[in-house]
Amino acid sequence: ANINLVTGAHYVPQIIEALDMARRNGLDIPVVYNSSGYEKTETLKLLEGYVDIYLPDLKYLDPELAQKFSYAPDYVQAAKAAIGEMVRQTGKCEFGEDGYIRKGTIVRHLILPGHTGNSIKALRYLHETYGEDIYISIMNQYTPVRKFVEFKELNRKVTKREYEKVLDAAVDMGIQNGFIQEGETASESFIPDFD
């Protein structure tokens, strides 16, 4: 069991207040902060001592891709700083006797079709910077939900060959603390119905 906060930056004061109250009343399970990685370090510093596990994304290591797909030319700089703050707070990943993570940072990276170079750069940066102190989740679940006119390369799923290329690079880098996806994960059945 855990408390999973998803994209909660705009509620940090309320989160802190609620967690203080819950802990006074006996809350004793890990708090997980699930994030795009595009966070201000000032906000994350407020969460020190409140969050046990950070789950940020590192979407891009190429500022041009960050601008092209997310209109965020500062994404790389912001995400690097945010992940650095998260790891500073949590330290090396720790697991309980049950095998579940109790403390640490797991960085997720979603491979985009046609952009394995970005993925390999992202993995290299994470591994060279944090080594085995973090876990890296290498995801192949990109699912196009509509046809893009402006981004034609995003109109398809990641191929098996692309995913294997990134996984092979991770192995060659010596990444040991990681998660991979097997089977068919790029399907609309994995996307919540928001209607």
Regions from the PLM with identified roles:
Residues 96-99, 105, 147-177:
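Conserved N-terminal glycine/acidic-rich loop preference
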Residues 182-195:
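Radical SAM enzyme core and accessory elements
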Residues 135, 176-179:
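Conserved beta-strand segments of alpha/beta enzyme cores
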Residues 1-152:
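Conserved AdoMet/S-adenosylmethionine-binding subsite of the radical SAM
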Residues 40, 75, 156-159, 195:
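General structural signal for secondary-structure boundaries
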Residues 139, 180-183:
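Conserved beta-strand termini and adjacent loop/short-helix elements that scaffold enzyme active sites
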